[in-house]
Amino acid sequence: MVSHYTRISVLILLFSFKVSAQETQNSDQTAKRIDFANSITANDLSTLLYSFAADSMQGRMTATPGQKKAAEFLQNFYETQGISGGLPGGGFYQNIPQEYFKSKYVKTDSENVVAIIPGSTWPQEYIVLSAHYDHVGAKGDTIYNGADDDGSGTVALLEMAQAFKQAADQGMGPKRSIVFLHVTGEEIGLYGSRYYTENPIYPLEHTVCNLNTDMIGRIDPNKAGNENYIYLIGSDKLSQELHDLSEQVNQEFIQMELDYTFNDENDPNKFYYRSDHYNFAKYNVPIIFYFNGVHEDYHQPTDTPDKIEYPLMAKRTQLIFHTAWEVANRDQRIYADKLENSASEKSDKR
């Protein structure tokens, strides 16, 4: 007869094996996640950016042949990677009619470029990774290449898409859908992101967050010599959950200095209102804006690929990838909890 104590010992042993197996599985998944992040390299970013910010793109001014060529570049990349277009039917271009742009510079329609990796568990919940791919064009024979602004954010999205696709091909999610949104018309008034949020391809109420990448390839003169920082703006405006997750992910995987200088409401630059994340925030979608700060080549023809700090840019991109990974794969969805708390406080005061 098996004694009561023997049964307990067997149960304890089985439980220990189960816990050990789970820990091993988690460890293996973390190791693979790090491998996917490390597939984002300085060399790959450089190769992409030298093509995307080349003179042949003519500065990518909205609704010009150079911008159209840049859109084709993005579509070709996604198709080569086996990543689907984000529009119904698998198309990549969200057309924006000329009349939508209140600008004398826009002479024809333009388009956002959208791709998607569907979620494996909650495909109707969306993380939107955004970057604007337009720039300020050319003046005569002088081309404004826009390598940092925002070629850097654009190719960062491409590298993250490739990493997420590798993970998906190996059966590792993402559990929620990842949308790669390349917006047009940012330089003339945030038009592309405004059009998307007014005409969303995926419902905004099911959009978990927007991680916006605009200028991540250079070093702010005020940070001279610091090769381990990034400015974060807006992470705690709508969601404390998102802010805390961002901090935890950075601490665990990257250990980069997260500088919130420009997150201050009293900061005179008002960067929170000056890039595409703001059009998501207006609809109460939690956001983070990743930014390296301005420099002497901002909106100058000297913003060229040779001046990019590629190892730092790779590390910044890996941080964004890890953050998106965590949001996409966690069991509980991120919400705009600051709004909920504010509403609760108002209700309590009544």
Please identify what each model-predicted range represents.
Residues 60-117:
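A non-catalytic alpha/beta surface segment that caps or lines the substrate-entry region
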Residues 113-115, 129-188, 320:
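Alpha-helical metal-binding/catalytic segments enriched in His/Glu/Asp
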Residues 291, 295-350:
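His/Asp/Glu-rich mid-to-C-terminal helical/loop segments that flank catalytic regions of hydrolases
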Residues 183-289:
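Metal-dependent peptidase/peptidase-like ectodomains
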Residues 1-28:
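Bacterial Sec-dependent N-terminal signal peptides
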Residues 30-39, 55-65, 101-104, 141-150, ...:
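Second-shell loop/turn segments in exported
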Residues 28-35, 39-69, 81, 85-87, ...:
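N-terminal capping segment at the start of a domain
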Residues 52, 78, 103, 107-137:
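Acidic/His- and Gly-rich active-site-bordering loop/insert found
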